[in-house]
Amino acid sequence: ACPVVEPHADGTTSDVRTCVFDAHFFHGKSIVTIEGHARKNADGTLQSLTPVQQAFIEHFSFQCGYCTAGFVAAATVFIDRLKREPVERADLESAIEVALNDHICRCTGYVRYYEAVREVALNTPGCVINEA
């Protein structure tokens, strides 16, 4: 899948499209692919999903899976950013649109992805300020 999460030394993350960068761009860098988001034990057995992954499942966000990696990467980076730079509740919808805007879904029409990300943002302490 195209997007991966790139952790930075300062604790921030970004989603990077592997499909538009040559492999040498990632030489010596740490990246997180879709397989690396969930928590696993030493044997590689799944222990728990991330809040983003769990919300996507609970909202039936994806059908074919084509876009899953991109939405997971973008939403994960977005929630990480909100933890450092929370948004006003009134600005949350537009912030989600900006964060997910570059990703293409061929099946669900995006609504379920947006609903899932909104839920994670609202349920993660410190991501949203001035909640109603």
What are these regions (language model features)?
Residues 1-132:
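Signature of N-terminal electron-transfer/Fe-S-associated modules in redox systems
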